Amino acid sequence: ADWRLLRSEGLLIGKVSSQDGENYQVQFQLFDVYKSQQLVGKRYNVPASGMRTLAHQIADIVYETLTGEKGVFSTRLAFVTEMKNADGSKRYALQISDADGANPRTVLQSRQPIMSPSWAPDDNRLAYVTFENAKSEIFVQELSTGKRQSVASFRGLNSAPAWSPDGKKLAVTLSKNGNPEIYVLELSSGKLSRVTHNSQAIDTEAVWMPNGREILFTSDRGGRPQIYKVNADGGRAERLTFEGNYNASADISP
C-alpha cells in the first residue's frame, strides 16, 4: 500500500512470534513514509509476563523518535482517592499505578485528607501532605520498603513539597513564622533554609528549575497571583508573568 496516499507521515510495523508458548520474540520497525527510511527498529525476546511492560517501552521509543521528547508510557501515576464508609465518614488512600491506570497499589490509607503527592527523581520515593496528626505535615515515603518519615511538622502550614532535580532537597511552603513562605529542606541533615521574605504575601507552589539553582513559585505580593523566580539559596525574587490577573502553578517543560 502507498501510505502517502493516506497522508501518513509514519508507519509502524510489528510482529510477535511464539517461541515455546511461554516466551515470545517481538519485532517492530518505524518508517518515515515520505523519505522511505527506517527511523528505528528493534527485536526483543520476552516472557509472556513481560509483554505489557515491553509494549510500553516500545511506545516510549516510538514517541521519542517522532517527537524528540521522552515518552511517559513506562512512568507511574500517584494520586489520592476519596471514599465513603458505611457510616458516611470519609477515608482517603494514596495510590500509585501505571501511566494508563493499570496495576493500582495503595501506599497509604488515612481517615484524614492526603494532598500534594510528589515523585522523587529516583521514582522510589513520594513526598506528600497528610493531616493524620490533626495538622498538616509533610512525609517522605519509600515505595520499595513502605518506610515513611515526617520531614516537616512545624507550627502552621506545611505544604506543597517539590523535589530538587538531584533528589536531595525539598522546596516546601511553611507558615511557621507567619505568612506562607518558600523554604528549602535538606533531607539528609534536616537543614532548613528560608528562600522568600515577604511579610504581606502568600508564597507557594514551588517548582525547581532543571539546573537545581533556581525555583519558580506563585506569589500574590503584587496584589494578584503571579509567577516569580528566585535563587534556591534566597535573594531577590524576579516576577516572570505580567499578562492576566491570575497566573499560578508553574511547570517546567522537559
Region spans (language model):
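Residue-level detector of Asp-centered blade-edge/turn motifs that repeat once per structural unit
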Residues: 71-73, 121-122, 165-166, 210-211, ...
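Structural motif
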Residues: 22-25, 86-95, 135-139, 179-183, ...
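An edge-strand/N-cap motif at the start of beta-rich repeat modules
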Residues: 60, 70-97
